[in-house]
Amino acid sequence: MSSPAKIAQTPEFLSKQLLQQQAALKIYDSMTTNKRSFEPLQAGKIGMYVCGMTVYDYCHIGHARVMVAFDVVSRWLRHLGYEVNYVRNITDIDDKIIARANENGEPIGELTHRFIKAMHEDAAALGCENPDAEPRATEHIDEMLDMIGTLEQKQHAYAASNGDVYYAVDTFEGYGKLSKRKLEDLQAGSRVDVDTDKKNPFDFVLWKAAKAGEPQWASSWGGGRPGWHIECSAMSTKCLGNSFDIHGGGHDLQFPHHENEIAQSEAATGCTYAHNWMHVGFINVDGEKMSKSLGNFFTIREVMQKFHPETIRFFILSSHYRSQVNFSDAALKEAHSGLTRIYQALKAADAVLNTSVSAAESIESINAEHAGTHSADFIAAMNDDFNTPQAISVLFSLAKEVNKLARDADDADTQAQLQLQAVQLRALAGILNIGQLNPAEFLQAQIGEVAEDQMSDEQIEALIQERLDSKANKNFARADEIRDLLQNSGIELEDGKLGTTWRRT
């Protein structure tokens, strides 16, 4: 695996630009269905809650998208100068967890511990920072019981004859406001199984009565365990208060989970629950949402056996977080080619400057006048609802400029400009936590991986471009190495006045 190079300190001019751009941030709010200027509830501070994983299996690529998306949101908010409290829960008691533990003949605690550990390993491999808090459902039963008691006292909840406690959706006037569904319309088209213990078919469980052989906790309603929805309401309130700035999760959680969270929390506290709702789009396979229930999912670990973790991160960031994305090997290979372009530019700069661009000592001398518009364009993209594909296009433009400067760096002035732009490229890429590995080691490792399978046209073109750059920088050994690799892979090159052409033999 490629070893990390020394990560650059953010250039002073970029830090100043970022701090000046707090007010320009706009976020699409699923509640209002508008992109609007972001204003934190408390100046300089942001509370963000994201629904995490139910830990009964390995995380799949859909989970990876949520992890990476909100990792970048958190990073960007911090770069803007905010103090962020990022909370992501863990559901460690649930019907699926109980069923899997029984299927395996494994204690529930051992099962959840194993998959929490695996989740953390996967997130770290994808370059995600740990949340500031990661509350587990089983550690906050008291808070859940308190909230259920408050809801019952305010006549939003009732105990049924079977020992369950339900939320009465009829008692909350705003039910459906997030998903834009009216309760009467839901009832009119309902195919919900009739449950004689419920007053309304859409009432949902807050507390499940104990069943033989299942974990249970004592309560005033008898032994049992919490429902899924109350977990997030109680834990978010515990960690962030009655109201907080951002609530996030996958688009599939908008209804009923997030709708039910709103009903519970706002009925219990009388406060607006979350002031901005962010939802990450689906990852599709052959036009269908990737999910465990459909059996069409790929675990992060399976995909990492074929692709570098940073390639997966780049694939996720190459699409806007709200869009739907189609998952395929071809899409991952295209992401690999794009990431390679950035590393090739950094490697070309290293070869000319004979030092890692991340450790440049003249960072403090860089100023906005010499840096061009790249940083401003990058900031504008990220402030536009975290538009990472547009931000990546800025990185591509900057990489192209770095390559050109590396080819023409015959004098001190050009070399100084090359160092400036290369440092800027790594610093901007670092905000997304890409491009921070040692370029030469990353590219060498990728050549070995590419050689194991037939190369795509994009991979061939990327290697040809690296060969041309290597020749221009008088790194003939590297150019010959790439030529030999392509020949051994059945790719014949022909150099001419108009450039290099190729064909498969």
From Swiss-Prot:
CDD domains associated with the record: Anticodon_Ia_Cys (cd07963), CysRS_core (cd00672)
Catalytic function, reaction form: tRNA(Cys) + L-cysteine + ATP = L-cysteinyl-tRNA(Cys) + AMP + diphosphate
Keyword Ligase carried by entry: yes
Recorded coiled-coil stretches: none
Biological process, per Gene Ontology: cysteinyl-tRNA aminoacylation
EC number: 6.1.1.16
Keyword Cytoplasm recorded: yes
Protein localization: Cytoplasm
Name of the protein in its database record: Cysteine--tRNA ligase
